[in-house]
From Swiss-Prot:
This is Histidinol dehydrogenase homolog. InterPro entries: Ald_DH/histidinol_DH, Histidinol_DH_CS, Histidinol_DH_monofunct, Hstdl_DH. One of its GO terms (molecular function) is metal ion binding. The keyword Phosphoprotein does not apply. One of its GO terms (biological process) is L-histidine biosynthetic process. The lineage of its organism: Bacteria, Pseudomonadati, Pseudomonadota, Alphaproteobacteria, Rhodobacterales. It comes from the Bacteria. Belongs to the histidinol dehydrogenase family. Its EC number is 1.1.-.-. One of its GO terms (cellular component) is cytosol. Zn(2+) binds at Q249, H252, D353, H412. Binds 1 zinc ion per subunit.
Amino acid sequence: MTITVLKSAPGLPPAPQGDAADVVQVMLARLRAEGEAAARDYAARLDGWSGEIVVSPDQVARASEQVPEDLKTQIRYAHDNIRRFAEAQRASALDFQTELRPGLIAGQKQIPLAAAGAYVPGGRYAHIASALMSIATARAAGVGQITAVSPPQVGRGVHPAILYAMSLAGADRILALGGVQGVAALAFGLFGAPPADILVGPGNQFVAEAKRQLFGPVGIDMFAGPTDSLVIADSTADPLTVAWDLVGQAEHGYNSPVWLVTDSAALAEAVLAHIPGCIADLPEPNRSSAQAAWDALGEVILCTDREEMAATADRYAPEHLHVQAADLDWWRGRLSAYGSLFLGELTTVAFGDKASGPNHVLPTSGAARYTGGLSVHKFLKTVTWQQVAPQALPDLARATATISRAEGMEGHARTADIRLEKLRPTLRQVGTG
């Protein structure tokens, strides 16, 4: 593979190891022992919130009145797309049964989880879309009870637009809690919520670490890191559009990588020339975030042809993969490692982040090599069942007993033998023994 790196990523300075893990471990131990009292104390000390933790329907209604009507309209538009896509996913998850041999019947069944916990970030940015992505998807899957948490703002509580989105998407219970205490409330079933079977939704390093430490007794959507995006662009792409797509994703934060992969040196140089102006056009703190991410983690890679571009993209396995190149059908068929694929100049990643329909909770840090993003399937248990009739028993019992004894598992073999012996008289009568 012959590639040229036109802009390299020097990377971030080493982060202190163990700090977040140690802090989270101590917090979870206290929350597990002291429950709601500890959660209230952390909310007061860390978020400056001493108000009600459980958000009542009346509070949601009053908060919704503060949301501008145009914003409500656009939230409903996004919710409708997300819900429709999730419902289509649910329809694709089918129960079935099949007769493998005469009398040997097996099947598959989809069972929704009893309870889900959705974490909705609310720090520097009000992540309205995250509420829709997590809650609407769980609702489409048929989850029994959905509890949502989001960090309260000092003197105000949960952001009104987030509350509106949570309610619209179908949350059964909303808690004004953020950080580790919010995740713990979902996992442990605090404030009247049932303990969650799965924890979903993005968050900062402490939220991600809390989910990691809780995983096992409770499921999680994924181990998520900073968001990342890769743009594939050929000579047909518009350099200014590509530059804005890179900068628009870099504004997520100083630790959000963005990569451009192209086979056009002219396009690469033009994009590099546009980047500073695009960053300068952003307001603060977005400008500083985008600049830091671009300086430390932005890369521009020049390849010889589209096959090399595709191979490079697959090696990076980005969370978001945006193709602005000719022959989109070829790219859709060739690319194989990404969280979500955005095809064509019109299909900016921001559409997927906010409103187009497919879920924006996606694998990061190269995890797209082996897994996909949040979907209704995360809220479903795909279980199997089997049933044996007399005519299937002789062959099945012999195979089981023989394999079991070859493995040294005599007890397993006896469970097959005893059934064959009990049915042998009947099997002789029907001529199958």
